[in-house]
Amino acid sequence: FMNTGLLMEAKNAGQVIGVIAHETGHIAGGHLSRIQAALDKSSAQSIAAFILGGAAAVLGQGDLAQAIIIGGQTLGTNSFLRFTRTQENSADQAAMRLLEGTHQSAQGLYEFMAILEEQELVSPQYQDAYMRTHPVTRSRMTALRAHMANSAYSRTPVAPELQAIHRRLRAKLYAFLEPTSRTMRRYKKSDRSIEARYARAVAYHKSAKLDKALKTMSGLLTEHPKDPYFLELMGQILFESGRVRDSIPYYTAAVKVAPSSALIRGELAHAQIETNNPALLQSAISNLRAA
């Protein structure tokens, strides 16, 4: 359900929280298991139409064959989308209940739906509702507006620490996914915020400017010595620059702070194995098992 594109597109932590609430609604509703049945049903309809269309073509009725095949594909698609629309509305309702129950605003979910609506390539009046991959966003937004009008938590702000985490997350993703030149334009050297320095460290690393990358990360670690993700990135920079042994203390420290992080444990195990040191092999195995 969650992916880097969504995390990059979300403009604030409230939007991510809203989407998480919505996706939790899918899980609570058992939609993951049901969606395969819907796919199977829609596929069966399309296959049946293809077989019938092939028979018509053999009989020399080409126009009829094409109509049967296209009609069958549309029927199958409509069947799947109709099922999806029901799921989406159910997940929205669950999200609103979850947010209300945890004293959080649904404003973020509403804002993210607005982003999705803006991304539609075709004006709503020209769209075929059955061909949309998402339910009619407008009706979902209307339901959310009604909820927010009656919720006691609609104006409840997102915790500042969560907003800070989201800014860091977006900065790191942007720096890894976008060209270095774009990262440096977006996170200028004059910007001394944590997220800007975080992004620049990644950009320097990608540009093989090891000294600048290490200096930037050292500064962040001086200010936040127990941040597991700063420790992890320092380890990654060293590891990917060929300094495998030097990376291990940082990965180890990161695991101590965040022992439940499977990704960090996996990175530590990888570094331990790459040293070719038999003394570290058992520790690497333990980390892989715990990951």
Which stretches of residues belong to each language-model region?
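Short coil/turn linking the two alpha-helices of tandem helical-hairpin repeats
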Residues: 242, 274-278
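Extracytoplasmic and endomembrane cell-envelope/extracellular-matrix remodeling and assembly machinery
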Residues: 74, 78-79, 84-263, 286-289
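Acidic/histidine metal-binding catalytic segments
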Residues: 37-40, 44, 66-68, 103-113
